[in-house]
Amino acid sequence: MGEINRRNFLKASMLGAAAAAVASASVVKGVVSPLVADAADIVAPITETSEFPYKVDAKYQRYNSLKNFFEKTFDPEENKTPIKFHYDDVSKITGKKDTGKDLPMLNAERLGIKGRPATHTETSILFHTQHLGAMLTQRHNETGWTGLDEALNAGAWAVEFDYSGFNAAGGGPGSAIPLYPINPMTNEIANEPVMVPGLYNWDNIDVESVRQQGQQWKFESKEEASKILKKATRLLGADLVGIAPYDERWTYSTWGRKIQKPCKMPNGRTKYLPWDLPKMLSGGGVEVFGHAKFEPDWEKYAGFKPKSVIVFVLEEDYEAIRTSPSVISSATVGKSYSNMAEVAYKIAVFLRKLGYYAAPCGNDTGISVPMAVQAGLGEAGRNGLLITQKFGPRHRIAKVYTDLELAPDKPRKFGVREFCRLCKKCADACPAQAISHEKDPKVLQPEDCEASENPYTEKWHVDSERCGSFWAYNGSPCSNCVAVCSWNKVETWNHDVARVATQIPLLQDAARKFDEWFGYSGPVNPDERLESGYVQNMVKDFWNNPESIKQ
């Protein structure tokens, strides 16, 4: 509990109890908020640490980016055997019905396959084909999955798909995108694309020009440089920003780029894709084209060795997320992915004009969550996501590597791990039952992991094969674990309630109930979210409310 005296403990206990007692009356929020903040600061003060806050075993090895759920999709070997969950039936662990175990068979049926489960590749390509709008979802007539909702989703993801090389899936180095040339004399657009660098562009040719002209900007100190970079990053579009030291542990052991081949589309244009879309749509099965693999050689591909990483967070829309698992919730995720590329590119240009090398990245190149933890932006939660103090897990992370030496931030602890031990709402809300129900995180061993997990770090198990299987069935990404999270809410005072509750025994059992008493989140049970009409009502509210609810 830390160094607190008896009087302060009693004060905090009474304040925490008072918060619980009045939790059904929203009129008192303004009164309770400062009291709860005081209690939280006494009982669960925010702390900083110089070391990485989670255990990393000596056996830890860097993660191969081609192992993650989405990149693994394009390995032809993954199309030879049925998708494999870590636990075939989790009901023996949770004591509840396993709502995810039948997904591989359901997805196979959607593809016209009889008598066997879908492969990993078939599962993921089913998702991608629906996500790109090339195939209707099975819910396309339902509120939240209509043509209107899908059109918004397409617009939100457009920059990520068209100008970022779909680095949301991972990969590196940088991004390559197909664009259609235009004849400036006739204004005719070609039907055959050419491959060019995307917004995650590692071309640092301008840096040497700045240096040769003696124009490299000199900062008075690492601290000043960090202050300036943070200010610039916020102006250029980030909602939160921190500085992490370059840590080789988080750089992927293998970089890779999906091999794209020309596919003739119904409109007559050629589109480069990493799978044969026309063949799939004509009933010919799923065929993928593999990867081009790269050694993680910074000097070869970016021209420098990183010293610092600028890590930033983009908030996702609260109203859109609470419609999960509808397509509207996917739209705010897509907007963030599109903005990640734009903001990272602008930060990289800023650094290059100052005479410093930069490599803008999304999910590619290295693991974002531990870098964000090192940058002081949040803690790692039960659902495997970064939990920030302001937005909870309702955000996306991007980063820019640079050779500019910056003063790093320190990891911060504000009660997330303690709360996640008690809450388990994200695990209960997962339609695929992909998130561990175990109380405590642990250093995962190989036998604890499914194929896309990296062992020997301290965390809760998350089965991406189950998660991705529901995405395929749903026809859209799912954000249930974000929507129900108590740290997701737009009013930060209930985050303080959560911090207090984890430290006071009498309140621990009610830790996950506080935001529910105020009507946040909606049903936790994934079936009830849909069957009760909650998701449909949230979609209607989203379209009927012209103003976004902001933090």
UniProtKB/Swiss-Prot annotation:
Activity over temperature: Optimum temperature is 50 degrees Celsius.
EC category: oxidoreductase
Family: Belongs to the PceA family.
Residue sites binding [4Fe-4S] cluster 1 per the record: 420, 423, 426, 485
Leader sequence segment: 1-39
Subcellular location: Cell membrane
Main location: membrane
pH sensitivity of activity: Optimum pH is about 7.2.
Gene3D superfamilies per the UniProt record, alphabetical: 3.30.70.20
Name used for this protein in its record: Tetrachloroethene reductive dehalogenase
Record GO terms (molecular function): 4 iron, 4 sulfur cluster binding; metal ion binding; oxidoreductase activity
UniProt binding sites for [4Fe-4S] cluster 2: 430, 467, 478, 481
InterPro entries: 4Fe4S_Fe-S-bd, 4Fe4S_Fe_S_CS, RDH, TAT_signal, TAT_signal_bac_arc
Function, in words: Catalyzes the reductive dechlorination of tetrachloroethene (PCE) to trichloroethene (TCE) and of trichloroethene to cis-1,2-dichloroethene (DCE). Reduced methyl viologen can act as the artificial electron donor.
Modification after translation, per record: Predicted to be exported by the Tat system. The position of the signal peptide cleavage has been experimentally proven.
Cofactor descriptive note: Binds 2 [4Fe-4S] clusters.
Reported cofactor(s): [4Fe-4S] cluster; corrinoid
Organism: Desulfitobacterium hafniense (Desulfitobacterium frappieri)
Record's GO cellular component terms: plasma membrane
